[in-house]
């Protein structure tokens, strides 16, 4: 479970970061 959660977070975090970067 934690493995899947970590993988999901690793994929989501950069995505969110990119979104904020593009907005800025």
From Swiss-Prot:
Tissue: Expressed by the venom gland.
Annotated localization: Secreted; Target cell membrane
GO cellular component, one term: other organism cell membrane
Matching Pfam families: Antimicrobial_4
Main subcellular location of this protein, as a coarse class: secreted
Function: Disrupts cell membranes through formation of pores. Has strong antimicrobial activity against Gram-positive bacteria B.subtilis, S.epidermidis, E.faecalis and S.aureus. Is less active against Gram-negative bacteria P.aeruginosa and E.coli. Also increases efficacy of antibiotics (ampicillin, chloramphenicol, streptomycin, kanamycin, novobiocin) when tested against E.coli, probably by facilitating their incorporation into the bacteria. Possesses antifungal activity against C.albicans and hemolytic activity against human, sheep and pig erythrocytes.
InterPro entries linked: Antimicrobial_4
Protein's UniProt name: Pandinin-2
One of the GO biological process terms: defense response to fungus
Annotated keywords: Antibiotic, Antimicrobial, Cytolysis, Fungicide, Hemolysis, Ion transport, Membrane, Secreted, Target cell membrane, Target membrane, Transmembrane, Transport
Recorded family membership: Belongs to the non-disulfide-bridged peptide (NDBP) superfamily. Medium-length antimicrobial peptide (group 3) family.
Organism listed in the record: Pandinus imperator (Emperor scorpion)
Transmembrane found in the keyword field: yes
Subunit structure: Homooligomer.
Domain of life: Eukaryota
